Regions:
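Mature extracytoplasmic/periplasmic domains
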Residues: 128-178
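A ligand-binding cleft/hinge motif common to bilobed small-molecule-binding domains
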Residues: 84-108
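Loop/turn elements at helix/coil->beta-strand transitions in domains of secreted/extracellular proteins
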Residues: 21-24, 80-83, 108-111, 140-142
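Periplasmic-binding protein-like
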Residues: 54-60, 64-67, 105-134
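Extracytoplasmic ligand-binding site segments that recognize negatively charged/polar headgroups
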Residues: 1-81, 92-98, 121
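Short secondary-structure boundary segments
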Residues: 29, 89-90, 161-162
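Conserved beta-strand termini and adjacent loop/short-helix elements that scaffold enzyme active sites
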Residues: 28, 87, 114-116
Length: 178
């Protein structure tokens, strides 16, 4: 409720450096792998210099010194300490599911997910993947494992239990993440 639809219209990750967000943003520490992958994505799309400037703007807009995990960022927004949290949707869904207790579920119900950069390259996503090592001694079994991970049964397990997005057609994401 503290962030308007007009503020989110056309919102991008790059926009998080805008001074209008001063004191309104929470995010994990820069050493976290999620932030490193987001920064790598921004470097790929915008270059090193622009991304360095972006990072300075984000730091200037932080509501507090980065602390805690993604759920801590969501809790901070729910508590009114900030207006925007950079967090993975599966943590929000985990909280909404009640698996982390009633306090976190209640907090999660106070926030909404938003997917930036929808007018251009799309939202940055962290990827979970499987790969085969050339010369692996059990290649046939490794292929079977990857094939199993790509079955509807496995993908539904991921979407319903870890709230990840599915990788195959015919399996829908959990309603808690969309």
């Amino acid at each position: 409720e503290r962030v308007t639809g007009a503020e989110l219209s056309g919102m991008t990750y790059e926009g998080l450096a805008d001074p209008k967000w001063k004191g309104r943003l929470v995010i994990r520490k820069s050493s976290n792998i999620y932030n490193k992958s987001l920064v790598a994505s921004l470097i790929k799309n915008n270059g090193k210099k622009a991304t360095a400037e972006w990072a300075k703007g984000v730091v200037a807009n932080m509501a507090r010194t980065p602390t805690g995990n993604d759920r801590a960022q969501i809790m901070a927004v729910a508590a009114g300490e900030a207006d925007i949290a950079v967090a993975n949707t599966y943590y929000l869904a985990l909280m909404l599911s009640g698996k982390k207790g009633p306090e976190q579920q209640a907090a999660a119900k106070k926030v909404k997910a938003f997917f930036p950069n929808q007018n251009d390259r799309g939202t940055h996503m962290n990827v979970s993947c499987a790969a085969l090592v050339k010369g692996a001694p059990n290649k046939a079994n490794a292929v079977k494992l990857v094939e199993f991970l790509l079955t509807p049964q496995s993908q539904e397990h991921f979407t319903n239990n870890t709230f990840e997005f599915p990788m195959i057609d015919g399996v829908s994401p959990s309603p808690l993440v969309v």
